[in-house]
Amino acid sequence: DYTNIGHQGYLTDPDTLELLEKMQFKSERLGNVMSGAHRMEPILRDADLVSFDASSIRASDHAAHSEAGPNGLDAVTACQLARYAGMSDRVKSIGFFEHNPDLDQRNLGAQLMAQLIWHALDGIYAQKADIPKCSLDEYTKYVIDLDEVNQDVIFHKSPRSDRWWMEVPA
């Protein structure tokens, strides 16, 4: 599974987005991320690998990149996303890429990269180890009956973290 977080629609080739959709991959627009970074937590919670490209951060917050532009993630949102990535009980690798020290006039970009790493580590230390693996006995179960499709939607809520999971029918 692959998810791209923070693409800018007017800079992204529509054929690329169409290909991602055909491959059943996801891509979240920058506007969706900026209007509520917390909505990215379930996506990042399920991540095994996170690659964070500095070019996704707007130039006013991180100019140490040759492709820096006026729009992108702000530093606060980037740090929130890094923490969510660290909080994933599944994550095996988090990488921060495309910082260019030669373009970092006042070392502000390096400071932001350090903050991103700190937030990812803070997320790792905040992991709850509550991924439902085998037994769901500890979890609160919620069943939503969808009469229109003759299907139940089942949610499980962790008593440890108050995080939710949804059962996906086979």
Q: Where in this protein do the model-derived segments appear?
A:
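Catalytic cores of soluble, metal-dependent hydrolases
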Residues: L19-K22, K26-A170
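Glycine-rich phosphate/diphosphate-binding loop of Rossmann-like nucleotide-binding domains
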Residues: D1-M23
